[in-house]
């Protein structure tokens, strides 16, 4: 794909990478895989030639996704795993994730890719889930989403037992599947700033609106996990992961910039997270 993008012959491509024609031929025929050193050289070469490797990865995933035929009641999603899925799917992520322990899937392949780019044994999956057969809730992209994330990340424990706390505990109780906005690399920085008191709820809500986030589907029960089908596994090369790391870093930098802009625009509007909790503790917020 890289060679075709540059309209080079195998000989020309080999010369650029300082390898033999036979080596390039073996790579392209699938008889050998470039080692890390060769892929690192390719990374520098692709950067120099402005080759959109990350976009090529997304295109490959899109083509594989389009080839999958699903029953009408199933939704196509993406999942990134740090070490691959072995055995049955279970709701066993870290407890303090956005929506608690569960099997996390999303509508945005880019989000799943940037989450696993640092892990050598990571695997990327195209999956599907049947929503209609599950007890599920879809949380709108508003303050309820942020507070539900706060609850599941353990940020609301100081008001445990209040009606406000119980509202969010009950919201996802006895559910198989939770659907809500995804805290991508940019939004992650904004919501963390909300929790530590650097931005108000108004700033957060406007960020949710401005970023047009994808959705995450989280199977939080075994029944929910049993409804998930793995449709395809997509191999990721070391070269592709290097480009994913770069994209993740760019997204985080944009998140910092966005949070700073929002801080300026909504400095005096809305309430800070601690103020919301204090009001809930005193019985003012239900």
Predicted regions and their residues:
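DNA major-groove recognition helix of helix-turn-helix/homeodomain DNA-binding modules
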Residues: 35-55
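ADP-ribosyltransferase catalytic core
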Residues: 74, 91-101, 107-169
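ADP-ribose/NAD+-binding catalytic cleft of ART/PARP-like enzymes
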Residues: 52-98, 117, 270-279, 283-284
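Active-site and NAD+-binding cores of ADP-ribose-processing enzymes
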Residues: 132-286
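A short, Lys/Arg-rich alpha-helix, primarily the initiator
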Residues: 1-5, 43
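Short alpha-helical DNA-recognition segment
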Residues: 7-25
